[in-house]
């Protein structure tokens, strides 16, 4: 990723947001709800990462919603004619939510500069991946959206 790219991570993405520039101090201030938390002044839930100057969008709690946030950011990038991308990350369980499908469909129809990364955790809470999707690979879902 490069400067100006936008990311919409999910709550398990501590390693990703650290790579994107969040510090251990940033994470601890957020986790302990401290006033100096750069994301929200201590008002956001733990693991709801954001850092504006690094292009990390704030997230909402329901899984899968980071997809539509990322797709919206990709639409803004396209409208502004910028050379950047937007990326959203989800677990395989989130890829079964309506926000995931609606977001990918919109991104595909409008040919947006959007990347979706699905982290296959093998279980969505208590459901094994063998009972979550019928495709051989999760990436095969992109074909249906013209990606």
Placement of each model-derived feature along the sequence:
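Cofactor-binding active-site loop characterized by glycine-rich and histidine/acidic residues
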Residues: 1-110, 128-134, 139, 144-146
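Short, ordered loop/turn segments at secondary-structure junctions
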Residues: 12, 119-122
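Active-site flanking residues adjacent to catalytic metal/cofactor-binding acidic residues
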Residues: 91, 118-119
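Short, proline-centered helix/strand-breaking motifs
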Residues: 113-114
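A short acidic, helix-capping loop that chelates divalent metal ions and anchors anionic groups
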Residues: 124-126
């Amino acid at each position: 990723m490069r400067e100006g790219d936008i990311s919409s991570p999910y709550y398990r993405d501590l390693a990703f947001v650290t790579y994107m520039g969040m510090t251990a101090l940033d994470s601890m201030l957020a986790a302990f709800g401290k006033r100096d938390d750069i994301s929200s002044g201590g008002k956001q839930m733990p693991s709801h990462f954001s850092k504006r100057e690094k292009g990390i969008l704030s997230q909402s709690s329901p899984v899968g919603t980071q997809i539509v946030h990322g797709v919206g950011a990709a639409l803004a990038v396209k409208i502004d004619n910028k050379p950047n991308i937007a990326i959203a990350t989800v677990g395989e369980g989130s890829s079964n939510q309506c926000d995931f499908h609606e977001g990918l469909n919109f991104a595909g129809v409008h040919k947006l500069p959007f990347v979706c990364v699905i982290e296959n955790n093998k279980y969505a809470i208590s459901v094994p991946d063998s009972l979550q999707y019928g495709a051989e690979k999760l990436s095969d879902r992109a074909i249906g959206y013209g990606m």
